[in-house]
């Protein structure tokens, strides 16, 4: 569901915000870490009975997009994408992308379910990274741009946005700050996710806000009629790394 029109601001205000963002993006902001991870083993034999080339393409596209937005981006897959490594890096992440299997997983110790996703680790038996694990490491610190390219992790009961310090609200950057969470509902096929994400990254590269980029990505057709995505955060933000610093005290 798109609600883009209700979040748009006057062109003059958007132009000021964009000029500020462009001024502070790029190499000068290289200290803002992002992690991009993709589960390739879980989409290849012997883990499944087919070979899927999209996880590698999706990782490359995401890493390029985050780098373009000013993040110091590390990419991890197969044996380098492990639960332990993800939780080590999340402490310092300002941006995070993952493509893998996701669900509302049962936690045996807590006897309840949490949103989460699976590591790669170069094997077919893949540990779950629960939202509670990420929340414990981040301790409430907000993340800038989070894209969870999995099944089920943008449904109403998802606990992942809060783990990354992003409220499940739709607002503007002056209200929520520079943060945006994107995910998919139900059983999402990576062929549809790939189409959506290409449109999303291209729109950001064309200097659309994250909310506008989401709306653009939703346009057109997908291979499965029930494909759906959702977001929470600041519609009017442009995705650049780091904290929001207004140009002056009266700009917002």
Where are the model-predicted features located?
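Bacterial N-terminal signal peptides that target proteins for export
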Residues: 3-15
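A domain-level signal for caspase-like cysteine endopeptidase catalytic cores
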Residues: 30-121, 148
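Active-site-proximal C-terminal subdomain of hydrolase catalytic domains
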Residues: 145, 150-252
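C-terminal region of N-terminal signal peptides and the immediate post-cleavage residues
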Residues: 22-31
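Loop/turn elements at helix/coil->beta-strand transitions in domains of secreted/extracellular proteins
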Residues: 69, 91-95, 141-145, 175-180
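Bacterial N-terminal signal peptides
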Residues: 14-23
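Caspase-like (clan CD) cysteine peptidase catalytic core
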Residues: 120-150
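Sec/Tat-exported extracytoplasmic proteins
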Residues: 66, 70, 97-100, 138, ...
């Amino acid at each position: 569901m798109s609600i883009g029109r209700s979040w748009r601001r006057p062109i003059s205000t958007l132009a000021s915000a964009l000029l500020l963002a462009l001024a502070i993006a790029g190499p000068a902001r290289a200290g803002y870490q992002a992690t991009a991870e993709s589960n390739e083993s879980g989409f290849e034999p012997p883990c499944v009975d087919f070979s899927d080339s999209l996880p590698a393409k999706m990782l490359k596209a995401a890493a390029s997009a985050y780098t373009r937005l000013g993040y110091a981006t590390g990419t991890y897959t197969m044996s380098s994408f492990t639960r332990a490594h993800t939780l080590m890096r999340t402490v310092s992440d300002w941006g995070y992308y993952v493509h893998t299997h996701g669900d509302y997983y049962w936690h045996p110790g807590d006897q309840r379910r949490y949103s989460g996703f699976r590591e790669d680790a170069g094997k077919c038996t893949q540990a779950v990274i629960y939202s509670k694990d990420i929340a414990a490491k981040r301790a409430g610190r907000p993340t800038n741009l989070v894209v969870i390219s999995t099944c089920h992790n943008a449904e109403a009961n998802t606990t992942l946005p809060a783990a990354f310090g992003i409220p499940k609200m739709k607002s503007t950057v002056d209200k929520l700050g520079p943060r945006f969470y994107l995910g998919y509902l139900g059983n999402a096929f990576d062929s549809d996710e790939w189409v959506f994400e290409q449109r999303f990254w291209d729109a950001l590269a064309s200097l659309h806000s994250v909310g506008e980029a989401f709306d653009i990505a939703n346009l057109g057709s997908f291979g499965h009629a029930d494909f759906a995505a959702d977001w929470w955060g600041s519609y009017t933000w442009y995705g650049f790394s780091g904290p929001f610093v207004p140009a002056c005290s009266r700009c917002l």
